[in-house]
Amino acid sequence: MKIAILGDIHGNIEALKAAYDAAVSSNNVEKIYHLGDLGGYAPFVNEVVDFLIEHAIEGVQGNYDDAVANDKEHCGCKYEDPAQAEMATMSFEWTKANVTEKSTDYMKSLPFEIAFEAEGRRVKIFHATPLKNNLYWHNDRDEDFFLHMARKADADIMIYGHTHIPYRKKSNPPSPPFSKGGRGGLVFINAGSVGKPKDGDARTCVCIADITPDNVKTEFLRIPYDIEKVASAIIESGLPSYFAEKLRAGK
């Protein structure tokens, strides 16, 4: 089974369109999923929601969606840098002030996770971790952390985002408790970010996962799009120009 995953979109409709076109152009993709965090940092949150609905793209709820839809005081982004925290607050307040009821209803409707079986393997999709949707799961976490998350997810293949930095990791732990994973082992995939990459590559990112009984072939497609159009829209919307600078830099 071959699927495409669209990580954190964050109000960037131009990046979403480019990522979607790349996903549907990839041979034999059966399903496209999104990982939530639909608004923030760019001004097209409502257009993003409309696009996902129009194209029947299933997905999960991110911490940003939860916070915006339920009128929370902050996004739960947990920035340690005070300057970044201040910018995040400005983004969050702007998004709450400009989001439509249709968009908040859609965000509220999103599940915490999506689970299914593919090629005899249990797949689970969530925004950040199987426990919390605002915990950062970077690839430098130790093996015990990865195995702990696999136990909590009760899955062989886990797909998530939140960090905006893509990676794939595989583990072949002894059985039990991972006797259901079969010969394919455990696979952990961070799909990166469609709308706000933080790995130094400003192009949009779409993850293609080709699941077989033995393996998960994973590609991270990087697609150019009109970044300046979005950067200009950020500034014109009244959002801080800082977000436009970060978008251009892929940070």
Name each region found by the language model.
Residues 99, 106-109, 117, 123:
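His/Asp/Glu-rich metal-coordinating catalytic cores
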